[in-house]
Each structure stands twice: as C-alpha cells, then as structure tokens.
C-alpha cells in the first residue's frame, strides 16, 4: 500500500516536476561540480596496502561500477574518491593489498551498468565487484517493473562475466542532504527513491547478491555534518564517501571471506 501511494504521488506530480527540476539541477551541476575526469575511456585505478603496512595474503582485485559516485564526482583527488576509500578499508579489513579499478560513469543508470559496464568485466579476473547505482533511475523515473528487470539482468550478467567474484550492490541513498534539490522536489525524489530501493533490495535477495542499504547504514550520518556534502549540494564530499565506504567495505570483506 505504501508503495502504491508513493507511486500515485509520483505519477501525479512527481514525474513532471522531477524532470523539470532535475534538468535545471543537472545543468547547474555540470558547471559547478568538483569531480575527477570522466570522459569516455577514463578509468580510476589505484593499488592500496593495509594502513598497518603489513600485508598477508594475495592481492584482491576489486572493480567498482556505477554512476557519478563511482566515477569520482565530489572528490577533488583520487585518494578521496569512493572507490579508493572502499579499497583502503577493504585492505585494512583483510590485511591484504587491493588493486582497484573504477569503471563508473557519471549519469549512469542501472540499464547502463548492465549494457555498458558489466561487459568490461570479461577476462579481468576479478575477485570482487562493487556496484553503486540507482540515483539516476530515481531522477529519471525508471518504473519499478523496469527497475526490477534491469537490476536482475545486471546482477545475472555480473555473475556470468565475473565468474566466482564476490558481488555487492550498494543501494540508493537518501536525498535529504541534497540541498541542490529544493523542496518539494527533494521530498518527491526521496519518496520515489524508497520505492526503487525496495526493488533493489528484493531483487538482490532473489539473486543471492549482498545488498548494502546505504540509506540506512550511511545516509543518517550526514545529518548535522555539512562537510559530508560536496560544494554542488548533490554529491557526497570525501567525508560523506567515507560514511558510504564504512558500510560497503565490511560487506565486501564478508563476501570475500564466505
């Protein structure tokens, strides 16, 4: 019933308002966001060792897929980006070096990860795949049925192309700290995000893939911490990405150890 009410609210006013509002936001973000280069073919690459300096065990090959959060938007340096922060925490948790490759693309939706990023896993010999996706599905009003189909296809393709690699799906965050979205747009976006987030969670469970609920495990930590958001008011800053990494890295470590 809650999902139906959310969909009715979104369908009545949310879709047209969101499409107009987000269009203006995206134009502004393009001119003001701080981010690492993301032109076609740009890849984030970093090899990190445990902070203790003592590495015991073989290198972990981690690939991070997804949207702007996986592409470095909001992070002035590579070391502060979400993929590298996750890799560093994973190295610390496992006591092993981590070789991280980030293939995220700003603006990507679930269907883009499925069709354009997942195929790049072939022959990479990866140990772990982290997918952080869904925010652009919210702002572009992907329907719940399409979200379920595309998420399922994405996870199955990841399983086929990544072999025995551990796979973790990071879910849609809360938009409560995204000051770039004025009210009531922010409320409408957050309402619809909750619908698609449940689709992600349920589909991941059906496919036997670990789901990390960023909205529950990380987003609440942004409250009262303005430095957690980047200057564009939409993407996390390094501090905020640290909150995300605190939730994502333990899940990867657990999957690698299972």
What is the meaning of each model-derived region?
Residues 1-63, 249, 253-256:
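N-terminal secretory targeting modules
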Residues 61-63, 69-149:
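Conserved SGNH/GDSL esterase-like catalytic core that processes O-acyl groups on lipids
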Residues 87, 154, 200:
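Aromatic/hydrophobic pocket-lining residues that form π-stacking "cages" and hydrophobic walls in ligand
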Residues 102-104, 171, 213-216:
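Residue-level recognition of beta-strand->loop/alpha-helix junctions
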Residues 132, 170-171:
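Alpha/beta-hydrolase-fold catalytic nucleophile elbow
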Residues 151-156, 197:
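Generic structural signal for well-ordered alpha-helices
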Residues 162-166:
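A short helix->loop->beta-strand "cap" motif at the edges of active sites that frequently abuts
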Residues 175-258:
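Catalytic His-Asp segment of secreted/periplasmic serine-dependent ester chemistry enzymes
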